[in-house]
Structures are given as structure tokens and as C-alpha cells.
UniProtKB/Swiss-Prot annotation:
Binds 1 heme b (iron(II)-protoporphyrin IX) group per subunit. GO terms for biological process: cellular response to hypoxia; hydrogen peroxide catabolic process; response to oxidative stress. The lineage of its organism: Eukaryota, Viridiplantae, Streptophyta, Embryophyta, Tracheophyta. Ca(2+) 1 binds at D62, V65, G67, D69, S71. One of its GO terms (molecular function) is heme binding. Disulfide bonds join C30-C110, C63-C68, C116-C311, C195-C221. The gene is PER4. It is found in: Secreted. It comes from the Eukaryota. This is Peroxidase 4.
Length: 315
């Protein structure tokens, strides 16, 4: 009964936010909003292609902490801890300045209209598309929070050593199912990880990691030191959005433990990974659907929250 009540609550929250959000939300109030954001994001990624992964991750880290409300953008104050300082974000999350630049560009044409939360969501879509990923309609109309939630960030952002059960339960609490989990994890076809996050995988086990892959990665990630050294999550096509991530998992070449647990355990995720490795169109379609679904998590709409003037501070 308790689980049923939780599912009903999640469904009601999701459906209410969906009723408030729409791809055409700004058509009458700021017709150039989405094109202005797109131009700003494309400029940023053209300067640093890795930024695409950072922007997708930023949207994920925003939505998983008390909903898609741009709380991740807020800097600390004497009375508020910042999510930027949480375990999963500190010296790791990136793209804040890109969102700030996009916000400034939008403010110059439509002051006080477009939320930072919407800019983050649109930026993630535009980033995906720019590096070869799918283009999907982003529903907009979110409003920004007036608080940050560091404790929730420490609790609800996935750990790089998370088990499949931990990940599945976390995603379920956010209203996302197993297919959503596997599809969204495919964003790790892009980006890089610090040595600290995969050192344990290289040196503490040998059962679920390809020996050659492990040997190669150890060269730049020694057992002692080098914790901040970066390595691509997908060694083959690190800057292109494709389905190679899933082929890597099938070959025991997932860089993070939380990636490799999706394949090889006999769980239901095995068949989804196999499907995506063989059918890039299905992966692209499911990734788009999961991103839209994630963007509906616990949004602020109507008169809730505010439209921040700058994304790093409440009005």
C-alpha cells in the first residue's frame, strides 16, 4: 500500500507539471528565447566540445535534486549551502558560466521572462544535438527555486560506485524506470571522468573489466596519485553522441563501476544494453523520451518560485 501511494504521488506530480509545461510556452512572451539559447550553447561547445557532456550532466544533477528548478546554479550564502559543493558536484560539475552567458543573452531580448531552469533543460538538448545526438522538443515553463538543497544532492546524486539496485531504486524514486536508467546512462558516451572515480575499478577487481582496457587506463591513473587526471568515458568516440557506450559495456570496458553494473549481471538491463548496442535509432528515441520525462521531475510552475535575474543568486 505504501509503495502504491508513492507511485500515485509521483504520477500526480508528474502529470501536474506536464500540464503546466509546453514546448510553445514562450511563443507569445519571448519568441526568440529558444533560438537565443541555442546560439549561445553552440558557441560554447564550438570552443570546447567537452562542454556538451557537462551541460547534459548539469541538467541531470539539477533535476535529481528537488526537481528541475536551477537550484544547482545557486552559489553559497551565509544562510544557504550550495549544491555545487556537494560530493558529486564539487570540482566536477561544469557549465555554470555557459548557462550564465545564455541567461544574459536571453535577458537582453526578454528581461525577466525565461527561467534558468528552462535554460538548463534547453541547453542539454542543444548540447546533445550539436555533437550528433537526437533533437527533441523541450517542454518549458519551469520557474526557479529560491533555495539550494546540498543535503539532498549528497543523498540523491548517483555515486560512481553505486550498485544496480541502488541506481534502480534511486531512479524509481524520481519516477523513472529501468529503461530510463539505461537510456540516460548512455549520456556517458560523452565526457570525461577523474581518475579518482574509477581507480577502484582498475585496481580492486578483475572479474568484470577487460584486461587490456584496464592496463591502458592504469597508465594515466596510477594506484597512488593522479586522482584528478581525466580519462574519456568512451575511449573510442569520446566527443560524439553515439551508442558506442553500450558496446563498451558488453566488452567489459565501462569506465565507472556504476556504468558496468548495467551489463553482465543477468539483470533485465542486460537485454536493454544489448538492444541499444545494435539499434542506435532506438537508443536515440528512448534517450529523448527519458530526457523529456526527467525534465518533468518536481518542476515549479505558475506562481511558484521565481524567474531569477541572474542564475547564481535568488532575486
Amino acid at each position: 500500500m505504501a509503495i502504491f501511494k508513492i507511485l500515485v504521488l509521483l504520477l500526480s506530480l508528474c502529470c501536474f507539471s506536464q500540464a503546466q509545461l509546453s514546448p510553445t510556452f514562450y511563443d507569445q512572451t519571448c519568441q526568440n528565447a529558444l533560438s537565443t539559447i541555442r546560439s549561445s550553447i553552440r558557441t560554447a561547445i564550438s570552443r570546447e566540445r567537452r562542454m556538451a557532456a557537462s551541460l547534459i550532466r548539469l541538467h541531470f544533477h539539477d533535476c535529481f535534486v528537488n526537481g528541475c528548478d536551477a537550484s544547482v546554479m545557486l552559489v553559497a550564502t551565509p544562510t544557504m549551502e550550495s549544491e555545487r559543493d556537494s560530493l558529486a558536484n564539487f570540482q566536477s560539475a561544469r557549465g555554470f558560466e555557459v548557462i550564465d552567458q545564455a541567461k544574459s543573452a536571453v535577458e537582453s531580448v526578454c528581461p525577466g521572462v525565461v527561467s534558468c531552469a528552462d535554460i538548463i533543460a534547453v541547453a542539454a538538448r542543444d548540447a546533445s544535438e550539436y555533437v550528433g545526438g537526437p533533437r527533441y522538443d523541450v517542454k518549458v515553463g519551469r520557474r526557479d527555486s529560491t533555495n539550494a538543497f546540498r543535503a539532498i544532492a549528497d543523498r540523491d546524486l548517483p555515486n560512481f560506485r553505486a550498485s544496480l539496485n541502488d541506481l534502480s531504486e534511486l531512479f524509481l524514486r524520481k519516477g523513472l524506470n529501468t529503461r530510463d536508467l539505461v537510456a540516460l546512462s548512455g549520456a556517458h558516451t560523452l565526457g570525461q571522468a577523474q581518475c579518482l572515480t574509477f581507480k577502484g575499478r582498475l585496481y580492486d577487481n578483475s572479474s568484470d573489466i577487460d584486461a587490456g582496457f584496464s592496463s591502458t587506463r592504469k597508465r594515466r591513473c596510477p594506484v597512488n596519485g593522479g586522482d584528478t587526471t581525466l580519462a574519456p568515458l568512451d575511449q573510442v568516440t569520446p566527443n560524439s553522441f553515439d551508442n558506442n557506450y553500450y558496446r563498451n559495456l558488453m566488452q567489459k570496458k565501462g569506465l565507472l563501476e556504476s556504468d558496468q553494473v548495467l551489463f553482465g549481471t543477468g539483470a533485465s538491463t542486460d537485454s536493454i544494453v544489448t538492444e541499444y548496442s545494435r539499434n542506435p535509432s532506438r537508443f536515440a528515441s528512448d534517450f529523448s523520451a527519458a530526457m523529456i520525462k526527467m525534465g518533468d521531475i518536481q518542476t515549479l510552475t505558475g506562481s511558484d518560485g521565481q524567474i531569477r535575474r541572474i542564475c547564481s543568486a535568488v532575486n
